[in-house]
Amino acid sequence: MGKTITAVNIKKLWYGDTSKITAKLTGVLLFNLLKTATEVKNVHGETWTLEEAEANKTVYKNQLTGKVYRSDKEMGEVKMNFTIGEYDYATKADLLGGTATDTTWERAKGKVSIEKFLVGLTEDDQYIVIPRADIAAREATTDKAVGLPIVGTEIEPTNEQVAAEYWFDASVVKSA
């Protein structure tokens, strides 16, 4: 039997450009990927979560027997959520869109579509990786400061070799 995990709380969090993931992830590839990623230095309070919605299931009954003879299932969405409590303008532009300099940020016009990979490292050393997440970010006042609540919804990678989600024990995330 493998190592028992709880995947409790968040210890580190990163995001980055989805084009950096070009093959099925391994611990070695993740180790190298993190070198290109942006680390989120502040997650406000206890806002980090990983949630999977319940699947929608439809059952079909045999009219003659009244018993289920087949079913159909649509899997629920997987989302990584967190609020950044302290950030710079570049981070705001990365996740909310728009243009940034060291001292200014300007909101983009129209609809903004942002995709990033997301990686969370839990307190019990489990890496959770979403290779392609649709990022929905906004401004929200939380505890008297304007934070950036982020919802990263897992979407199907464009590369068939890449899974929609990976988990790695930290013991395998190392250089070759």
What are these regions (language model features)?
Residues L50, S71, D102-T103, P157:
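Basic, gly/Ser/Thr/Pro-rich low-complexity segments located predominantly at protein N termini
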Residues T103-E139:
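Acidic, glycine-rich flexible loop segments
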Residues A53-A55, G85-Y89, E123-D125, I155-T158:
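Generic structural motif
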Residues I84-R107:
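Charged, amphipathic alpha-helical segments
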Residues K79-T83, F117-V119, P149-V151:
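Beta-strand secondary-structure signal
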Residues G2-Y87, P131-A145:
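Solvent-exposed edge beta-strands and adjacent loop segments
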Residues D124-A176:
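Mixed-charge, glycine-accented linear interaction segment located at domain edges/termini
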Residues K20-V40, G98-W105, E160-F168, K174-S175:
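Short secondary-structure boundary segments
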